[in-house]
Amino acid sequence: MPADAASPRLLGGAAAGSDALVLGIETSCDETAAACVRGGTDVLSSVVSSQVDLHAKYGGVVPEIASRAHNELIIPVVARAMVEAGVDGRRIDAVAATTGPGLIGALLVGVSAAKALALTWDVPFVSVNHLEAHLYAALLEDPHLELPMVVLLVSGGHTMLVLMEDHGRYRILGQTLDDAAGEAFDKVARFLGAPSPAEVPRGGKPGRGAA
């Protein structure tokens, strides 16, 4: 995870303790998401459009289908995030977007939209490393957490134990060598004939054949 390729720490330095307003865009896999965040931790809005129903019949995410769905959803999702935050482009100080890891086609949609908005509003575009953003999620939840700390990162194709020594300084203590936890879970579920997440009953009721 190259520290200079990600923005949480950069935005932390620029926005923490200030009123800097950042529009964040995420399209790394099968969710189109946008959020407006002030001062690094104050989430004014967070809009997520899931494609889980769209991919259910395939037993997993289909990259091409995901990319096309992002193309259709990116503008309304961003617009809704800004409306819910009560802001317009004149108040945005920077636009951030996930640039990887992730599905290439899906990432391109979010990055292209973010760069276009940044250019239109004449504000900086900030590249976000997907994995580094996950590390910083804990700090978003509790800004008072102190470094160094050990983080268990489980996201899609990545499962690793990371030591956050300082902002932008990380050491991978261990990681899966082949399939990540999520991938292994999906493969076993398909082998057992388990339903896709979209078909799993909600409310604590076990699905058919649940162990």
Question: PLM ranges: what are they?
Answer:
Residues 2-20, 28, 35, 154, ...:
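A short helix-loop
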Residues 4-20, 128-150:
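Conserved phosphate-binding catalytic cores of ATP/NTP-utilizing and phosphoryl-transfer enzymes
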Residues 10, 17-91, 97-101, 108, ...:
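N-terminal beta-alpha supersecondary unit
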Residues 17-20, 30-32, 41-44, 90-93, ...:
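Short coil/turn connectors at secondary-structure junctions
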Residues 24-25, 96-98, 129, 150-155, ...:
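Short beta-strand segments
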Residues 97-121, 140:
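Short Gly/Thr/Asp-enriched flexible loops that form oxyanion-binding sites at enzyme active sites
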Residues 114-134, 174-180:
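Short, acidic/small-residue loops that bind anionic groups at enzyme active sites
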